[in-house]
Structures are given as C-alpha cells and as structure tokens.
C-alpha cells in the first residue's frame, strides 16, 4: 500500500505492507497544484514514489505493473469534491496501484490522532482547516479556501497579522506594540516597515514570514496586548471550527475526540493551548482534545490499512500497531 501525505509545506510518501511493515519512505516539498498545475504536482509525487520504491528495493521504471494494491493519498489543496475527484483521477492514471482514494490532508491528521470511527480534527499549520467524521461515513467539512471562505489564521495568516499590526504601530495608524521591534530584530532590519519593503523587493523571501509565529508567541508570553489578542483570536477560530463540526455531526454533547495538529498547535504554546482548551470545554464539555505530533503520513497509512481490511486484503489492529511503531522508531 502506498501512503501519501502531501501538505502545503512538505510531502511524505511511504510504501507499507498489508501487515504494517514500512518498506520505504521519501520526503519532499509542499504540494501546491494551484501553482504548478495538477500534472506538475503529481510529477512531484512521482519522484517521491520512485524514491520510496528504491529504498524498498523496487524499480518502477520498467512498467512492470502496479507498485501497490492501493494508494491512500491525503492532499493539501484537495479542498472541494471536484478537486478530490480531479486529483484522484490524475493519481490513478499513473498506474501505481489497483485502487486509489484521495482525501483532504486533514483526514490524515484525524486518523493519526484517533482509532475511533468518529471525531473531529483541526489543523493549524501553514493554514487552517477542520474535518469531522461519523461511523456511517458522513463528514463535516469547510471549503478552507482562505479569507474568501471565512478562514482566519494558521501560520501564514498569523504572520501577516503580525506584520499588519507592526507596520501600523510604526506609522501611527495602530496601537504601539512590542511586535514591531521584535519583527525588526528577527530579520536584522531597522523596522517592521523595512521588513515589509524587503519582502516586497524580494530581498527577504515571503516564505520566511512564517518565522514570525514564534515571535508572536514570545511577545504574547511577555504580555504585549496586541500579541495576546492575536493568540486569543487564533484560539477562537480553532474552537469555532471544532464546535461547528461537532454540532453538524450531532457530537457537541457527546464524548468525541477532537484532534489538534499542525505546527502552530503542535508547538503547545501555553497561552494558545490554555485558550483553546478553556473555550472548547465551555462549548463541548465532553469533547476529548488531544494534540497530535505523529507524522500525518501515519494517518494516510492507517486509512490505507483500513481500506485493505475492508477488502479482506490485510490491515487490522496488529498492522495498525506495527505502522505506528515503525514511524515512532524512524522519528
């Protein structure tokens, strides 16, 4: 079985046997079909599939048939059903397996975080998203297309808010904040406005702005009001997603796992986590939150093993334990 977890910032591929042994893995950059086109994005996956196969001692260059029985691909930017179908068709066309299932990458986080057949997952990493699942297959989802669909936060969004508050503090349009000096110091420039200019001119890569998330946390820990407000706003958004998903699935008053993951949440910053847990307990007192740092590719692999088990081709509890243990050793 071929497990793929392709996020905005990195992609992991694993070749896993039906009993949970990990034969080969590969890691690459982010999966962004909106920048590269679908074919270009799948080409990037193909290179990683070949790398994982090579580690397993397999050569897939000769066209000798499918590499695996099944592909379980959990992909960022597969946000709409039409996108999932398009990507599933594109991956299936590569001939890596007999069957292919594509899902949004947040489902990998959910599966990595719980073996229960129901629950909710919120990812807050480069972006922010949420999914929920019931045993009968019903789901709760959000478009997660950014501000245009009501999203706020994630590392990318928070970083822009930090820049917004910092530059406005410097030019007089906003309240003073320690963020301004902290942003300037982080990049070794004279001011936050100078950082903005450097990003605009290409002197500082825009991709480095995510480095401002720890800067925000530090200023919040030191009591800067603007920084504290941003952290609290992020907590509100995380809980809003989780509570709405729970409500849609009829789980708001039930004992259900709420899996929290992605780089921003995995950092377990105390102010953020305290705010998330307090707010979640107020709206869903029986919810069982858990922060997951297990690589999401484990979730993709577990979903693949679930598929094999449903087809009587392997999988099962022992295989799930084996794949979790294998990745724990690799960490």
Tell what function each PLM region has.
Residues 1-5, 68-72, 101, 119-123, ...:
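Short glycine-aspartate micro-motif
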Residues 1-60, 66-68, 113-118, 163-331:
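ATP-binding/phosphotransfer module of carbohydrate and carboxylate kinases, centering on a glycine-rich
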Residues 6, 64, 93-95, 112-116, ...:
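Solvent-exposed alpha-helices and their adjacent loops that cap or buttress functional pockets
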Residues 9, 76-79, 126-129, 265:
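Short glycine-rich anion-binding loops that position phosphate/pyrophosphate groups of nucleotides
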Residues 50-101, 111-114, 257:
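Short beta-strand-loop/turn "lid" adjacent to the catalytic site in phosphate-handling enzymes
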Residues 69-71, 91-94, 98, 137-146, ...:
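Glycine/charged-rich beta-loop-alpha catalytic/anionic-binding loops adjacent to active sites
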Residues 100-108, 123-124, 149-152, 288-298:
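Active-site nucleophile and cofactor-binding loops and adjacent substrate-binding regions
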Residues 117-174:
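Glycine-rich phosphate-binding loop of actin/hexokinase-like ATP-binding domains
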């Amino acid at each position: 079985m071929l497990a793929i977890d392709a996020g905005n910032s990195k992609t992991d591929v694993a070749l896993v046997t039906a009993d949970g042994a990990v034969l080969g893995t590969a890691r690459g950059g982010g999966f962004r079909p909106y920048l590269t086109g679908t074919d270009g994005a799948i080409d990037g996956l193909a290179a990683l599939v070949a790398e994982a196969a090579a580690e397993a001692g397999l050569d897939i260059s000769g066209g000798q048939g499918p590499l695996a029985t099944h592909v379980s691909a959990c992909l960022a930017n597969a946000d709409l059903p039409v996108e999932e179908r398009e990507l599933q068709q594109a991956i299936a066309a590569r001939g890596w397996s007999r069957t292919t299932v594509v899902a949004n990458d947040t489902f990998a986080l959910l599966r990595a975080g719980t073996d229960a057949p129901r629950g909710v997952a919120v990812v807050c990493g480069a972006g922010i998203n949420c999914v929920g699942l019931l045993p009968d297959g019903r789901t709760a989802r959000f478009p997660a297309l950014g501000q245009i669909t009501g999203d706020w936060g994630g590392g990318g969004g928070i970083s822009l808010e930090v820049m917004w508050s910092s530059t406005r503090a410097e030019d007089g349009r906003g309240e003073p904040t320690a963020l301004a000096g902290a942003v300037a110091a982080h990049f070794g420039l004279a001011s936050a406005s100078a950082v903005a200019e450097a990003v605009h001119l290409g002197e500082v890569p825009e991709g480095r702005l995510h480095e401002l998330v720890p800067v925000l946390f530090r200023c919040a820990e030191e009591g800067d009001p603007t920084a504290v407000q941003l952290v609290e706003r992020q907590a509100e958004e995380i809980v809003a997603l989780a509570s709405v998903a729970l409500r849609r699935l009829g789980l708001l008053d039930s004992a259900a796992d709420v899996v929290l993951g992605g780089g921003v949440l995995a950092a377990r910053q105390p102010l953020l986590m305290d705010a998330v847990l307090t707010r979640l307990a107020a709206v869903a007192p029986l919810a069982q939150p858990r922060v997951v740092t297990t690589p999401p590719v484990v979730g993709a692999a577990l979903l693949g093993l679930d598929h094999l088990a449903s087809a009587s081709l392997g999988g099962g509890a022992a295989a799930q334990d084996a794949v979790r243990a294998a990745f724990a050793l690799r960490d």
